Amino acid sequence: MSWRSEHIWIDLITGSRKISNLCWAFTLFLGSLGFVLVGTYSYLGRNLISFFPLQQIIFFPQGIVMSFYGIAGLFISSYLWCTISWNVGSGYDLFNRKEGIVCIFRWGFPGINRRIFLRFLLKDIRSVRIEVEEGIYAGRVLYMDIRGHRAIPLTRTDENLTPGELEKKAAELAYFLRVPIEVF
C-alpha cells in the first residue's frame, strides 16, 4: 500500500503478519503437537489416540524420534508465532522531496535494534536499481543505491511482483526522486 502527493511518497511495508505465515505457524503447531502426543503416549503405553494402534508405535526408536521432531517443531512454531506477534519486517519508506530526505523504518526483533530507522538526503541517492535473478529461485528486487552506503532493498524477496509491476514501480520512484534506473 502506498500514498503519494506532489512532494511526499509513503510506501507501507507488510511484515511477517501475512496469511501464509499464519497458516504455516498454525499447521506446524498442530503437527508438532500431534508428534509430541504420539511420542508421549507410546512412552506411557496408553492408547489415547484412537486412530493409531499403540502396538505399531513402540517407544524405542519411533516414540523417541517422534517426540524429538515434535519438540523441534514446537520450537520452530513458537519462533513463527513470535515473529508474527512482533510483526518483524513491517514499516514504511518515506520519500520527501520538499525537505530533501528519505526515511526508511522497519520493525526488528526485540532488543537494542528493535527499531531500524535510516535517514538519507535525496541528493545522496545515485539510482534506483532492479536486480533480476534467473533460475529455479528467480527473484526480482528493487534497490535504492546510496553514495557511501550499500544498496538498500525496497521490496521484499518474497514479494512476487511481475516484471511489468516492478518496472512500473521503479520508473515511478525514479521519476519521483529524479534519479536514473539501473538494471542488473
UniProtKB/Swiss-Prot annotation:
| Record key words, sorted | Membrane, Photosynthesis, Plastid, Thylakoid, Transmembrane, Transmembrane helix
Q: Write down the membrane topology.
A: Multi-pass membrane protein
Question: Is the keyword Magnesium assigned to this protein?
Answer: no
Task: Say yes or no: keyword 4Fe-4S present.
Answer: no
Q: Where are the transmembrane segments?
A: 19-39, 57-77
Q: GO terms for biological process?
A: photosynthesis
- GO CC terms of this entry: photosystem I; plastid thylakoid membrane
UniProt subcellular location: Plastid thylakoid membrane
- Cited Pfam families: Ycf4
Q: Which PANTHER family match?
A: PHOTOSYSTEM I ASSEMBLY PROTEIN YCF4, PTHR33288
Q: What does this protein do?
A: Seems to be required for the assembly of the photosystem I complex.
Q: Which family does it belong to?
A: Belongs to the Ycf4 family.
UniProt protein name = Photosystem I assembly protein Ycf4
Task: State the organism named in the record.
Answer: Cuscuta reflexa
- Source lineage: Eukaryota, Viridiplantae, Streptophyta, Embryophyta, Tracheophyta
